[in-house]
């Protein structure tokens, strides 16, 4: 790790100094009259400087990744406590109400393209460095190539989930002239490219590094398999939704996405196997906390090698009306790089690399926090069962109105998300919901940001099983229920008891299991930048509608999926907004963000009033030039 941070903090500054004097175009990271000299690529240190630069650049986009992947979802409301320190309150409220337009700077995707260009630099110059540096081996280059190919694919994957059709290039961009050559590439076409790219390098990255922070903070084989599972899950949804025309019955299996759903199961298991091996190789003495109990909560036979952090003392602490120990919360969020982690962006107080206070910018109950938690959505996810809501430890830190903490100005008791705060949970007296004592000290600004972890992959597999179901209560339905219950049990105070399950014997149909997966993902990943993406995928899988897609007339516009997603999830606690959301989103294009107006300007026009890179047809409210 010392070598990593030496390169990270010294070489990276040199790379940044060379490359970040950018012109104002969204893909250009070098000034027009200056590109990196060919002599820059002398040895592996030059490659590694650019390699770590890509990770840093992606980490600097964290606020946008949260807005794109989470903000619009059913998990949040604008903070009920209005404060002048909430500088983005008006903007975020517009986004929550689906009032998107191309002048919102949060939809500027340029920073992600900069990370992509760093990846392209590494991939384009690796062979040259290999030829020049005798100490740099072919094996090391192949591992780095696999890692950076996956990182580039992850960046593009964020973009197609956020904007649908995007500009795609696997070449280094160095000038404005090259920008003018770009036209949009369709979402599904880009996804096909990404899957093929990652398929070509799977299993070729490193399994682990000497330091656990590198193992969890750089892309390894377990992260690559998780990424493949995620991309196949999305492609299965896109294919299924485009095969659905008119009115859609989710109880009826649509086989268009079945092959990809099976791939989710294959690569999900591969990711979990790789994580299991990785953790064995690391060992408790080399980075992981000792004294943890790991359980599979009934997964074996459906998914193998599952090791979830158990909260064994939670039930006894709760019954004794005392401070409740929640090791899963402590290890996954407060400490980071847990045994369940597959890939997380690293932030470190010792290296002065913070997350910019982004997590407290969105969550918590301080004066600067912009969001409250939508308790109605969480209650529905718990089966409208208040007892389950109170006894699921995840609600204690993602949707709690019984709290006390530093920085809180609340005089009432709205619900907030404290996932990224330092929390202590105290069950006292007759209070059924433990009181959360939270703090946002300096360490919070240096907590890692999790991209993939074990329960994420497990619930991808549960969704894939639901997709593959062809009859009520078949083996796939039973497998999906087993996985959902395993994830749920870990966080319920009863743990292995019968009351800890969330599914019921009556949950036998494909559409019901897809709904249950979405509910469990809300409970598990609220505040982790995933919820809106999940809802988009759900809507895309349904598709349907009576009108043609505005950009692809061979398929319908997906409006039925949009409407069902709003009715089933977004409406919880927001019934007054339902008709407005449906009117504003219109069709599947309304699920995605607008193209930032300066990026359209950079691409120019093909004729008066016609941009080379057209605006999202739902958010077609642009400044004109």
Language-model features and meaning:
Residues 2-11:
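Bacterial N-terminal signal peptides that target proteins for export
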Residues 19-22:
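C-terminal motif of bacterial Sec signal peptides marking the signal peptidase cleavage site
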Residues 24-27:
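Bacterial signal peptide processing site
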Residues 42-46, 51, 55, 59-62, ...:
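Elongated scaffold/linker segments in the mid-to-C-terminal portions of large proteins
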Residues 44-61, 66, 83-163, 178-216, ...:
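Conserved, well-structured interaction surfaces
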Residues 152-153, 228-229, 446-494:
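Extended amphipathic alpha-helical segments enriched in small hydrophobics
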Residues 160-167, 234-243, 467-472:
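Short coil/turn linking the two alpha-helices of tandem helical-hairpin repeats
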Residues 165-187, 238-266:
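Short coil/linker segments at helix-helix boundaries
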